[in-house]
Amino acid sequence: MKIALSGKSGCGNTTVSSMIAKHYGLEFINYTFHDIARERNIPFSEFYEKEIIGRDDYYWDRYLDKRLFALSKKNNTVLASRLAIWISKSADLKIYLYAKMEVRAERIMTREGGMYSDVLSSTFNRDENDKKRYLAIYNIDIDDYSSETDLVIDVTNINSNEVFELIRDEIDKRNLKN
């Protein structure tokens, strides 16, 4: 079974994907810019500003997505990334998580700290930068996900356990097996 899960920052992509992987005994694949920054011993904010926003050759996007594309070919996986539903063409189930920006900012603030107004602003800016980059690199509009998904879940008012249950119900309904 192969599952691809996408959504913007603060929607619970990583949390829910890891829950699915653990429950079904699947490999959890989630390689992000945070991981690259950590590997390079650079704070994420500095890496993002200098290496993602500050470059116009999209080197790190291509590096990350090439790695994710190769990993997406493996079986018995849950791939969690902004572009997972577009990258993993052979996924048995493609899921997109959605939440209002204000809720995502609250969740990010809880996870990472900071002042709400700053987190809200940076969340908005990151969304805009992501959209611009993915359009430029791949001609993918990350706000136009409906044709790429089997299941869209608005997570604005539900927690990760409830999201997991909805996904588990869909997996059972489709009779997907590991």
Swiss-Prot record:
Keywords: ATP-binding, Cytoplasm, Kinase, Nucleotide-binding, Transferase. SUPFAM superfamilies: P-loop containing nucleoside triphosphate hydrolases. The keyword Protein transport does not apply. It is found in: Cytoplasm. One of its GO terms (biological process) is pyrimidine nucleotide metabolic process. Its EC number is 2.7.4.25. It holds the Pfam family Cytidylate_kin2. GO terms for molecular function: ATP binding; CMP kinase activity; dCMP kinase activity. ATP binds at G7, K8, S9, G10, C11, G12, N13, T14, T15. One of its GO terms (cellular component) is cytoplasm. Gene3D superfamilies: P-loop containing nucleotide triphosphate hydrolases. It catalyses: CMP + ATP = CDP + ADP; dCMP + ATP = dCDP + ADP. It is an enzyme of class 2 (transferase). It comes from the Bacteria. NCBIfam families: cyt_kin_arch. HAMAP family: Cytidyl_kinase_type2 (MF_00239). Belongs to the cytidylate kinase family. Type 2 subfamily. This is Cytidylate kinase 2. It comes from Borreliella afzelii (strain PKo).
